Amino acid sequence: MHPPPVSGGPVTSKVILVGQAPGVREPIAHKPFAWTAGKTLFRWFQEATGLTEEALRAKIYFAAVCRCFPGKAPSGSDRVPDPQEIANCSSWLNREIEILRPRLIIPVGKLAIAQFLGSTKLENVIGRSFRSERAGGRFDLIPLPHPSGASPWHKILPGRDLLARALELIADHSAMKALKNSGLRARGPGKTLLP
């Protein structure tokens, strides 16, 4: 693991989005999903909910299975954190769930999904909502595939249709609707981030 750790910032929210780990550029940008995969993720959310990246970053708590960039794999792609690294960071996610008491958690990608549902095929979980428990909290869980350009899963069938269904479930969830209707204000008089 390569410091510094990356988090989404001090946002109190009933919605937590959980990613795998920061990529190589996120520590420089000081925010999760700061590069190509993030652009795709925020486009998905904007199309489904109407919320911009700025509004989502201000209203959703961004967490990760691992807090630091895990380094590169021999293939040149980002290395998947190993079980010991995941165990070392698990207390952070547990504590965040204890403190925030989310109503909705959105795990993004296989590694994040596995932390809640075990190892499974994406076809078995994307497009579905689950009631889950962790760290003393009960919440709804709506998984998303990783938005990486390296994986075509979300671009082809059945992935494309399952992703659309998952985004519908997220947009229709009461916790997400509450965020959308919260009237978040941007800096400056009369500016609103949310419709």
Model-derived features: positions:
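Short polybasic linear motifs
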Residues: 185-187
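A polyanion-binding, active-site-adjacent surface
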Residues: 1-179
